[in-house]
């Protein structure tokens, strides 16, 4: 890759806490016991390489992804990694978003993760439980010391505004949504609103389910920088203020390539060319979800 090393991008949470803008997603991990050892190894390699944000959920692999994450964290800590250096994110299902059900769900997640406290606990998507009750549940978990921060996922702007009207709702620390170079709908109103409130937008599927890595334009831009199309997709996202990207944990080669994307700085001409093929939205559209 061309160019000098650049500072690794970070995001700032409403509390002022700073964390890396590049983290690891764990969707599809923990689904097959036959892959357990290789998945734990991949996460261990990521932690050894410097990755410090891991995103999981009770839904992923029916708790299996949290178990894989927990085993990798335990092994890394035995090797000397400090717990406080890793920012662990998990999510509660909407069906568990009531006060009592959330306590049980969080306790189970903590057990699978092998942790005393989750750094950021998200409502995976909005369900039938009133937001006020969900916020009270998050606050109870904070008082117990089981979570540090709480947030939401797959919330559009109207949902965020409604959340902010709920007592305690303004303590929301983040919103995780589907966002990439080819899925830019949130730029119309949600992303600017979150920037205004200094609330990171956590982006899942930054390769748009792999579609971007096959796009001819990303191949052309990558060739100019002696990079890969995946690195171009990540570099674009990392240059969007307030965005934290969560590519899925893969094999060792993919981990190295994704990590190196932090060193790639796209030029103004690169960004303009990408904008022409993947323009920012001019009107409101329904929130994209996976």
At which residue positions do the language-model features occur?
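Active-site mouth loops of central-metabolism enzymes
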Residues: 25-37, 90-100, 124
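Aromatic/hydrophobic pocket-lining residues that form the small-molecule binding cavity
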Residues: 39, 69, 102, 106, ...
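Beta/alpha (TIM)-barrel catalytic core signal, keyed to glycine-rich beta->alpha loops juxtaposed to Asp/Glu
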Residues: 3, 126-290
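Short acidic capping loops at alpha-helix termini that bridge into adjacent secondary structure
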Residues: 21, 55, 80-86, 116-120, ...
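N-terminal binding-site loop/beta-alpha segment at the start of enzyme catalytic domains
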Residues: 1-84, 290
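Short, acidic/polar
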Residues: 33-47, 98-113, 160-161, 186
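CE4/NodB-like, metal-dependent polysaccharide N-deacetylase domain
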Residues: 102-122, 140-144, 166
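A short, structured active-site edge motif that brings together acidic residues
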Residues: 82-96, 120-124, 154, 177-179
């Amino acid at each position: 890759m061309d160019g000098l090393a650049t500072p690794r991008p970070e995001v700032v949470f409403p509390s002022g806490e700073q964390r890396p803008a590049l983290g690891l997603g764990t969707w599809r991990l923990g689904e097959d016991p036959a892959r357990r050892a290789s998945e734990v190894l991949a996460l261990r390699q990521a932690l050894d390489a410097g990755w410090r944000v891991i995103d999981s959920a009770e839904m992923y692999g029916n708790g299996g992804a949290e178990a894989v994450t927990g085993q990798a964290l335990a092994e890394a800590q035995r090797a000397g990694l400090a717990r406080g250096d890793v920012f662990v994110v998990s999510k509660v299902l909407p069906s568990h978003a009531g006060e009592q059900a959330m306590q049980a769900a969080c306790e189970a997640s903590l057990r699978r993760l092998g942790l005393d406290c989750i750094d950021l606990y998200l409502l995976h998507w909005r369900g039938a439980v009133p937001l006020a009750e969900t916020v009270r549940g998050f606050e109870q978990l904070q008082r117990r010391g089981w979570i540090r921060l709480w947030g939401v996922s797959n919330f559009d702007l109207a949902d965020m505004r409604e959340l902010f009207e709920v007592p305690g709702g303004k303590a929301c620390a983040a919103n995780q949504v589907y966002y990439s170079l080819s899925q830019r709908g949130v730029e119309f109103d949600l992303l600017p609103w979150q920037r205004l409130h200094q609330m990171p937008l956590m982006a899942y599927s930054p390769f748009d389910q792999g579609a971007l890595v096959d796009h001819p334009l990303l191949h052309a831009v990558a060739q100019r920088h002696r990079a890969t199309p995946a690195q171009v997709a990540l570099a674009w996202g990392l240059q969007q203020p307030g965005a934290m990207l969560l590519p899925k944990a893969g094999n060792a080669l993919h981990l190295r390539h994704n990590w190196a994307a932090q060193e790639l700085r796209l030029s103004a001409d690169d960004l303009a060319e990408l904008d022409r093929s993947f323009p920012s939205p001019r009107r409101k559209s329904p929130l994209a979800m996976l």
